[in-house]
Structures are given as structure tokens and as C-alpha cells.
């Protein structure tokens, strides 16, 4: 029987406080997260940002127990998916490839080679495609595969995004319905979708389909929820987790929460739409920071829908996703890692540092170059600012 390897790709996260700095360094070393004008600046900038952010991030992880549960939850998802696939008659073994912390993609490839896998199915644990999540993981996998003559021979099928998959939608509706049923007036409960944001330039310059997929997904969930409940709830979509001075996708979660409070919303059902497992953004950012903002805004009942984790309907849906990938049209790693052509938007390979598009982007890039020059002068101890006596 053919040996099938199911590779689950995820972000990764620090398991201990001492992991936080190295994890952040790995994150900001990725050019899909932060782009510098010249590649040589990438790692020095990553070191600087990770050093500056480390203490604050450590405090956030301490507030949820001292580390991220993302590896433990992903391993549980992998085990249950493997069991479900074997129940359905597939000789499948699951593997985990984290992008920025252990176990890394290299480790998963080594394990698949050692196990003699005949075919690989790649599932990003991000329902919606983005340059900075699935795209980065696919491109890392492609780079490693291209450099490994043995692994390159193994057939590989990829799922690019799966936000419209029936099992995913059904599991989301089940978990949302649980929280709605606890509200004082279920039909009046406000459904508040919050998705991880990305810089606006990813969408407008690079053609990232993430925003459109998030919007489509929220409407699909609302439609399925209405069929399930028999009534329609008011709903809102926002974006969280922005960092830095550039504009990210709007509306911002904290601003919408304040608006909903002013609108006298009493029952708020918060749906972390872009997260399939609990981690820092759900446990700390939503459960602590945003809950406090909501309460200060006057929202009486703040109910957060659990992440999918190992919800049985979700695991069943993942198994169906793997099977449909095996039986459906081939999507190889080259196709999975590329952005679609979009009118008036740049394909990913052309999304380079340059002077184009909006004045906001232009000014931001000038500021970044000035910052990098200043950083180099601080490190080297010499330069025009030293000669002028400013430094």
C-alpha cells in the first residue's frame, strides 16, 4: 500500500520564556514578514527588532503560562488526523513543519525520508492564504525540496487554502452556536470576527488574496450559521495584531470594540476566524487585552469562541481535505507558493523594494533606509552623525 505523508505546516511558537528572543529573530529574519532594501540588512534588522521586542513579548507569554501551546495542539491535531485517515483505509502518517520554531521543516523532511514516504500531501494550518503565512511556508518547503535530490523525487500535492471547505465551516458554526446559546438574547448577539491582520501593502501592491478570502469566509460562516439557527445575527469583521508604523488592514479590532460599546452592544461573541489552534493571539491578545477594551467600552458579556483545536468535526473535515487533495486535480509546490495574477497588482516575484505606488509606501521606505543607515552607524561607531557630534 502507498505510504502517504501528510505534512501540516504552522507558524510555531516559543515553548519557554528563553525561546522568545530566538523565535522572534527567526520570525523577523523572514523577508515575507519584513522586507529590507538590501538582503544584507535582513538579519541585523531581525536581531534589532527581536532584541527590542523580547521583554514585552516575554511578559505576554508569561501571562498565558510561560510559553505557546501551539506545538502541543498541532501535535494533537496531527495524531487525531492520522488516526482518522487510517480509520478510512489510508496508510497515512502525519508530520509537522513549523516555520519559526521547532520542529522545523527540515526535521519533517528528514522524518519523511526515513519513513520511506511515497507521496506527500501538504496542508497549511491556515485556512486563508497569505504571503506571510502559507506563502512563506510553501516557499521554504520548495527551497528545501529543490536542494534535496532524493526528496525532490517524491510526488507532492498541496492545498493552497481551504476556508470554504464544508468540514471547516461546519465546525466553526458548531463552536459559534455554543457561545450564542449562552447569551441572554441569542438572536441579538453580535458576532465579532477578528482575523490576524497584514500590512495593507501586501494586498494592494503584492496581490495577497488574504483580505478577500477572510471576507468571503466570514460571509460563508454567517450564511451557514443562519441555516443552523433559523435567524440572522448582526456581525462585524476586524483585523488584529498590527505592529509597526505602516498601515495594516482595517478596521482595527480595538477600534471596532470601542464603536460596538458606544452602540450599546451587550452580548458579543468573538470569533478568532484565522486561527485553528489556541496561541498567543487568542489566549493573551483576545482573552486579556481585547476583553479589557470591550469591558471598558461598556460591553457586558464578552464570549470568545474556542479555537478549533481537535474539535471532532474539524478533524473529520481535515481528513476529507486530505482525501480530496489526493483524488482531485494536482496542485504542486510551485503553484502553491505563487500568487495569482491580479490586475494592477504585482506578482510576488516583482514585489521588490523600490519607489512606486503610494506616497505612504514611498515615505515608509525612505524612513526605513534612514533607520538602517542610523543602525549601521550606531553599530560601527563612525559616520556623518558622529562627525557632526550628534552621536
Swiss-Prot record:
Its EC number is 4.98.1.1. Keywords: Cytoplasm, Heme biosynthesis, Iron, Lyase, Metal-binding, Porphyrin biosynthesis. It holds the Pfam family Ferrochelatase. Fe cation binds at residues 196, 281. It is found in: Cytoplasm. GO terms for molecular function: ferrochelatase activity; metal ion binding. Catalyzes the ferrous insertion into protoporphyrin IX. This is Ferrochelatase. It comes from Prochlorococcus marinus (strain MIT 9301).
Amino acid at each position: 500500500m502507498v505510504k502517504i505523508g501528510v505534512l501540516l505546516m504552522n507558524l510555531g511558537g516559543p515553548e519557554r520564556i528563553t525561546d522568545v528572543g530566538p523565535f522572534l529573530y527567526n520570525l523577523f529574519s523572514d523577508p515575507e514578514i519584513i522586507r529590507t532594501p538590501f538582503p544584507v540588512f535582513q538579519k541585523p534588522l531581525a536581531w534589532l527588532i527581536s532584541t527590542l521586542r523580547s521583554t514585552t513579548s516575554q511578559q505576554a507569554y508569561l501571562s498565558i503560562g510561560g510559553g505557546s501551546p501551539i506545538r502541543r495542539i498541532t501535535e494533537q491535531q496531527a495524531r487525531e488526523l492520522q488516526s482518522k485517515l487510517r480509520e478510512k483505509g489510508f496508510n497515512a502518517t502525519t508530520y509537522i513543519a513549523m516555520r519559526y520554531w521547532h520542529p522545523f521543516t527540515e526535521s519533517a523532511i528528514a522524518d519523511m525520508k526515513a519513513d520511506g514516504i511515497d507521496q506527500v500531501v501538504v496542508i497549511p494550518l491556515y485556512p486563508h492564504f497569505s504571503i506571510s503565512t502559507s506563502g512563506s511556508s510553501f516557499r521554504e518547503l520548495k527551497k528545501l525540496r529543490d536542494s534535496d535530490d532524493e526528496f525532490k523525487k517524491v510526488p507532492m500535492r498541496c492545498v493552497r487554502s481551504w476556508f470554504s471547505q464544508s468540514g471547516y465551516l461546519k465546525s466553526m458554526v458548531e463552536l459559534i452556536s455554543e457561545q450564542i446559546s449562552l447569551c441572554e438574547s441569542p438572536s441579538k448577539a453580535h458576532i465579532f470576527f477578528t482575523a490576524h491582520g497584514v500590512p495593507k501593502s501586501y494586498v494592494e501592491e503584492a496581490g495577497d488574496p488574504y483580505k478577500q478570502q477572510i471576507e468571503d469566509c466570514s460571509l460563508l460562516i454567517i450564511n451557514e450559521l443562519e441555516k443552523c439557527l433559523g435567524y440572522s445575527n448582526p456581525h462585524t469583521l476586524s483585523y488584529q495584531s498590527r505592529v509597526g508604523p505602516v498601515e495594516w488592514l482595517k478596521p482595527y479590532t480595538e477600534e471596532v470594540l470601542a464603536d460596538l460599546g458606544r452602540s450599546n452592544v451587550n452580548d458579543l461573541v468573538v470569533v478568532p476566524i484565522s486561527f485553528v489552534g489556541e496561541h498567543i493571539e487568542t489566549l493573551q491578545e483576545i482573552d486579556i487585552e481585547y476583553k479589557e477594551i470591550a469591558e471598558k467600552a461598556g460591553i457586558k458579556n464578552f464570549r470568545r469562541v474556542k479555537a478549533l483545536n481537535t474539535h471532532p468535526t474539524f478533524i473529520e473535515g481535515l481528513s476529507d481535505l486530505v482525501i480530496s487533495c489526493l483524488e482531485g486535480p494536482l496542485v504542486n509546490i510551485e503553484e502553491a507558493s505563487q500568487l495569482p495574477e491580479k490586475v494592477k497588482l504585482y506578482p510576488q516575484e516583482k514585489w521588490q523594494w523600490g519607489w512606486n505606488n503610494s506616497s505612504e509606501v514611498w515615505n515608509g521606505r525612505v524612513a526605513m533606509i534612514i533607520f538602517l543607515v542610523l543602525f549601521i552607524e550606531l553599530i560601527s561607531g563612525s559616520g556623518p552623525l558622529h562627525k557632526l557630534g550628534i552621536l
